Amino acid sequence: MVVEGVLNPGAFQFEGKTWLVLRIAERPAQGAERVSFPVLNASDQVQIMEFKWDDPDLDLSDPRYVRYKDMTYLSTMSHLRLMCSEDGIHFHEPEDRPSIIHGKGNLETFGIEDCRVTCMEEDYYLTFTEVSRNGVGVGLMHTRDWIRLEHEGMIFPPHNKDCALFPERINGKYYSLHRPSGVDLGGNFIWISESNDLKYWGRHQCIMHTRPDKWDSARIGAGGSPIRTEEGWLEIYHGADHNHRYCLGAVLFDLEDPSRVIARSDDPIMEPEMDYEKNGFFGNVVFTNGHVVHGDKLTLYYGASDELVCAATFSMDAILDTLKKTYCRPD
């Protein structure tokens, strides 16, 4: 298998170090006559599927997918890999903990992706995307020591992804942001839900829409866990336009009622500018689902062009100052 991308890491602090849960996207080396891609079979073993490049029923117009007749597959299969760092820049595999998390079962036959990590009540909760021919949903795992992971299964069924947990209970309830995908009606909007136990979710509300003619006109989705500030819950989210250009923005939710949007970025706080952000496996993409906070310093770990992992630092106060210029509501 060939690694096509290392991208979209979850991030957290543990035992005095910065840790990332990387997404590793792989596929077989491509031959001259056939396109090939991996899936998991019923025994959780990797099986290689192939189609001839010149097959008229084959659609490879989007490098992320292999479409054949009435079926859609992923061109790569992803697993998760744990890395740690003493300085937040230079990362290595941990020596005393398992570092690889593979997909398994019939809900993860196309892999697992884009993990978000939330530390809450001494435990670490991992929400991640489960992909299979059954659709795209959200899975949940948790751990306290990063040695044993407890799998809770799928908590949001297809089609859903981009699930970020709030890092504490609010009025006795757990809250999560997530992104159901509208097919014919609705759209790729951000929703909020609440739960008593993190496994079963209800009181679903749509709280953020895409905005016509803006940088986030086609789809939006949550980044890492919301960050508590004096002004409200600060969330860094991604938005894309109809040309599939992904940027990052900020939104502020009410501390006591996180379904209420206080403010939202008019303009991106980050957009593809560097060559490695504009060109790659799937270019013009900056995408975050993990960060760490030290005082006013916010370090975003993000995927560039679905191929690389990068880091960028921001002032929390500076982001909040830009939001003070706006007042918004779901539109």
Please report, for each region that a protein language model flagged, where it lies by residue.
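Structural signature of WD-repeat beta-propeller blades
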Residues: 113, 163, 224, 287-289
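Short glycine-rich, acidic/polar surface loops and turns
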Residues: 276-278, 286-290
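Beta-rich carbohydrate-recognition and catalytic domains
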Residues: 1-110, 118-218, 227-281, 295-298, ...
